[in-house]
Amino acid sequence: MSDLFIGELITLSIMAFALGMDAFSVGLGMGMVKLRKKQIFYIGFIIGLFHVIMPLAGMAAGNMLSGLLGVLAVYIGGALLFVLGVQMLMASFKQSEERFMSPAGPGLLLFAIGVSLDSFSVGLSLGIYGSHPLLTITLFGLFSMMLTWLGLLVGKQVQSWLGTYSEALGGIILIVFGLKLLLPI
């Protein structure tokens, strides 16, 4: 394996972790409700699936934009990651109403779309940047699925304060990667 591939693997793993923290934090809240193990498995699987579909769609759009915009596209991608990270960080400190939705049927579908929308934006940025699609969606799907499961399971045991901090950590990580693309460091 080349150093470039290993670097991309590490970078994408950290990004996948950051995006999965959103699903983890919401999973913590959902986990406070009594769920059976089968429901926990199904919820994590659906969240992981949407964290594959959304960045893939974003990467396809990003690849098209990259061809049209050239070098400027990298800066646009960095700006998108930065803004997404700031939004995620700010949202973590807002006192919001109960974010819980029914963990089945349409409620689960809306939940999965909601927590994977940021993956579309990141996928757009990575498509502009020219990232490996298969590696990206595999990591995003696995990380989000496992972190959702972890959030649901830990949610049964832990108070809700951890959810705010995990979402803030995810936002900070995205800000750092956005700055990395924006600033030639």
Curated annotation (Swiss-Prot):
What membrane topology does this protein have? Multi-pass membrane protein
Which cellular components does GO assign to this protein? plasma membrane
Annotated S-S bridges: none
Q: Which Pfam families match?
A: Mntp
Query: Which GO biological process entries does UniProt record here?
Result: intracellular manganese ion homeostasis; manganese ion export across plasma membrane
Cellular localisation: Cell membrane
Keyword Manganese applies: yes
Give yes or no: UniProt keyword Oxidoreductase: no
**What superkingdom heads the lineage?**
Bacteria
Q: Where are the transmembrane segments?
A: 4-24, 40-60, 64-84, 108-128, 134-154, 165-185
- Give the UniProt keywords, A-Z: Cell membrane, Ion transport, Manganese, Membrane, Transmembrane, Transmembrane helix, Transport
Main location (coarse class): membrane
GO molecular function annotation:
manganese ion transmembrane transporter activity
The UniProt similarity line reads: Belongs to the MntP (TC 9.B.29) family.
The protein's role, per its UniProt record = Probably functions as a manganese efflux pump.
Q: What is this protein called?
A: Putative manganese efflux pump MntP
This protein's species is Bacillus subtilis (strain 168)
